[in-house]
Structure formats: structure tokens, C-alpha cells
């Protein structure tokens, strides 16, 4: 990793696919585009995402996860033991290809290494983050038709994820984020769910981040310091930063990835709004322990709005950096 400024800015992972990529995917599904041309479209989309992140001034970018349709489906298609029966309605007219576990979970082959290798080759910085869905979330968002209990399923998934993470490190990954938005879904699972995350990152030599978002953090908060990652990033903006009191109560001692952009609201935050929110966060945590990010992935927004939100996030962060510099902090 290269040196980062104080209050590094990053993204959670996903970013809107360009319209032309969505059209390319449609044509490919209709048999009107070759596999080779589709891969070229994916590669071009990754370059476009990096261009947006670079222009916005993001310190730690991702490739936007543009090759992945969904965060669970992608991995279920590549890990042995899953089967898809058909789409399941989530709400209204929205459907999700929910996977079913029908046999023992086994790691097959690298799932993200090619994706990461290409991203690394076109990234504007070596401070590149790669994301992977965590074992608990994959299990919680799947049907279990094989394992006697969910815990056994989750720990087998943790072993598979661990192997993938180690392959990413071998390929040169320096910052790896485990996405666990479902970890705080069921209070009775949290203690061993945390153990499963630790199993997934066991023996990994990289900067490790965990992402958690939306829901009640209260019954997972006592376990945050037990999770063997360097940083946990949270959705905070949508909750008006109320979880900061909870984190303070339990002596949160890791780097805080602070969500300052609402990804479910098309209204673009102003840079001053972001700066004010960061000042609020710094009342609870020292700037050396804080990273700045959106609440969650940006894929559900239009590309224009997602980009504008990142610009405001970065500009607001710069305002606070300058204030800290005047107070004697080293910000570069």
C-alpha cells in the first residue's frame, strides 16, 4: 500500500454499470454478442469506473463490481454445493435468483483473481480494494437443503472464502473487504457468526475490512472488537449518526469506516453537509482512526448521481483535512 492522506476516502464496492454495459449484457443473453465482446465490454466498464473514481478524487477505489449481478448469486455460481431453481420475489416486481445449498460446500477454483488482476492493471493507484461476500451473508441469503444446521454451512463457506482470500493476496491484493450485511440479522447467531468471519480471514496477510449495513447494530456491537479485521465500515448517514454512541459505549477500537453518503436517496449531499457530518464523527473518534465512505454500494443510483455524491464526499473531506492541518495534524 502507498501512503494515504488523513481521513482516506473510499467506496464500499458496487458502482452503477454504464448503460452500454447493460445493453451488452442484454445482447449477450439474447445470443447477439460473443463472449469475447462481452468481456471487452466488462473491461471497458471497469476502466470507466476507475475514471469516475479518479475524477472524483477517491483515495481507495474498487472496480465497481461491474462483473457481478448480485453479491450472493455471483459466489453461489462458483462454489460447489449450490443450485438455482428459479427467481424468488423480494418485493413488488423485484426478483432475486436465490441459491439453494444441495450438497457439501467445496472450493472449486479462484473466483475473483482474474477480476482483481485486470483491475490492478488499470487502476490509478495501488491502494485498490477488492470485495468478497462473507460466509454468514451467503448462507443467510440462501436456502439450506443439505446441512443439518446453518452453523455447519457457514463454517464450510468460511473455509472456501478463506481460500479465495489467500489466492487474492497471492495475486497482490493489499486491501480486502468482507461484506457481511446479514451478520446482525439474527441475535442468536451473532457469536458464532463472528467466529466464522474470523475463520474466513485466518492466516491472511493484508489490510482487512468488514462492511456491515442497515438494521439494528446493538446486538452485534459487543462483538465488534473480537472480529479480526483492521476496519469495520458502517452505514451511518441514514441513521443520522446515532450508532456512534453505541460504538463509543462498547469501546470500538478499530478503524471506523464512516458512511457519510445516503445511497438510497437521489438527493446529492453538499460538500459542506459532508464536512459537518465528518466533524460530528470526529467528536467520537480521532481522525487517524477514521476513513470516509458512502453508507453502502452505489449501484442502485444513476451513474451521474453516484459520481456527484462521490465528488461531494471527497470535497467535504478535504475541507475537514484543511481544518485539521491548521490544528497541527499531518494530513498528507
Curated annotation (Swiss-Prot):
InterPro entries: Met_Synth_C/arc, MetE_arc, UROD/MetE-like_sf. GO terms for biological process: methionine biosynthetic process; methylation. Pathway: Amino-acid biosynthesis; L-methionine biosynthesis via de novo pathway. Its cofactor is Zn(2+). Binds 1 zinc ion per subunit. The keyword Methyltransferase applies. GO terms for molecular function: 5-methyltetrahydropteroyltriglutamate-homocysteine S-methyltransferase activity; zinc ion binding. Keywords: Amino-acid biosynthesis, Metal-binding, Methionine biosynthesis, Methyltransferase, Transferase, Zinc. Catalyzes the transfer of a methyl group to L-homocysteine resulting in methionine formation. The physiological methyl donor is unknown. This is Methionine synthase.
Amino acid at each position: 500500500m502507498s501512503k494515504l492522506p488523513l481521513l482516506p476516502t473510499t467506496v464500499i464496492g458496487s458502482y452503477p454499470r454504464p448503460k452500454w454495459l447493460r445493453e451488452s449484457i442484454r445482447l449477450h443473453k439474447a445470443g447477439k454478442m460473443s463472449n469475447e465482446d462481452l468481456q471487452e465490454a466488462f473491461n471497458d466498464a471497469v476502466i470507466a469506473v476507475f475514471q469516475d473514481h479518479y475524477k472524483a478524487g477517491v483515495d481507495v477505489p474498487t472496480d465497481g463490481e461491474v462483473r457481478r449481478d448480485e453479491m450472493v448469486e455471483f459466489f453461489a455460481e462458483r462454489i460447489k454445493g449450490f443450485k438455482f431453481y428459479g427467481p424468488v420475489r423480494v418485493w413488488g416486481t423485484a426478483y432475486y435468483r436465490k441459491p439453494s445449498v444441495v450438497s457439501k460446500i467445496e472450493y472449486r477454483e479462484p473466483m475473483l483473481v482474474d477480476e482483481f488482476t485486470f483491475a490492478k492493471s488499470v487502476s490509478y493507484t495501488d491502494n485498490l480494494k477488492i470485495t468478497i461476500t462473507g460466509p454468514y451473508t451467503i448462507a443467510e441469503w440462501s436456502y439450506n437443503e443439505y446441512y443439518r444446521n446453518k452453523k455447519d454451512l457457514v463454517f464450510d463457506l468460511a473455509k472456501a472464502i478463506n481460500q479465495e482470500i489467500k489466492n487474492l493476496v497471492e495475486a497482490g491484493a493489499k486491501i480486502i473487504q468482507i461484506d457481511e450485511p446479514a451478520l446482525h440479522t439474527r441475535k442468536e447467531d451473532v457469536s458464532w457468526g463472528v467466529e466464522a468471519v474470523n475463520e474466513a480471514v485466518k492466516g491472511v496477510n493484508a489490510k482487512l475490512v468488514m462492511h456491515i449495513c442497515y438494521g439494528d447494530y446493538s446486538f452485534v456491537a459487543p462483538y465488534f472488537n473480537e472480529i479480526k479485521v483492521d476496519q469495520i465500515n458502517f452505514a451511518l448517514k441514514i441513521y443520522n449518526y446515532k450508532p456512534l454512541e453505541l460504538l463509543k459505549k462498547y469501546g470500538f477500537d478499530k478503524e471506523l469506516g464512516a458512511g457519510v453518503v445516503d445511497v438510497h436517496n437521489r438527493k446529492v449531499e453538499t460538500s459542506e453537509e459532508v464536512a459537518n457530518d465528518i466533524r460530528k464523527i470526529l467528536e467520537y473518534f480521532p481522525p487517524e482512526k477514521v476513513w470516509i465512505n458512502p453508507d453502502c454500494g452505489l449501484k442502485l443510483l444513476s451513474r451521474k448521481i453516484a459520481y456527484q455524491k462521490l465528488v461531494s464526499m471527497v470535497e467535504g473531506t478535504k475541507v475537514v483535512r484543511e481544518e485539521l492541518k491548521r490544528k497541527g495534524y499531518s494530513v498528507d
